[in-house]
């Protein structure tokens, strides 16, 4: 600390650091922590500079969860409910659909279970195809950059 001066009957000193340049009472000079110098030291050591890893682009069309057999049934039921009960509330349709599902036998439910399994297989196939396509695109991109060098 340097530059002691008299101000309001107290003696102050300025911090020698260019970025800090604060006035500090001489009695408290030893207690002064110069955060500007502290941050520069950390930056010189590599702290505070965050490098972001490259993220692979995610496919927004990818289904996060597959449909259950009940969901497949409700999708089918809603289509028929709209035509049969024109003007009824959606809430009523959900209640009626749930009551119908509970009253169905296991054999009737099995059809919807099979449809749900088929849709899940189709979803997995499309996800695999899209993953293969994106891998091929990345490989082509790498080859192009290698050819440029």
Curated annotation (Swiss-Prot):
Query: Where does it mainly reside?
Result: nucleus
Q: Which InterPro entries match?
A: HMG_box_dom, HMG_box_dom_sf
Keywords assigned by UniProt?
DNA-binding, Nucleus
CDD domains recorded: HMG-box_AtHMGB1-like (cd22005)
GO MF annotation list: DNA binding
Here the segments flagged for biased composition (Acidic residues) are: 117-149
Q: Does the keyword Zinc apply?
A: no
PROSITE patterns named in the record = HMG_BOX_2
Which locations, inside or outside the cell, does it occupy?
Nucleus
Official protein name in the record: High mobility group B protein 12
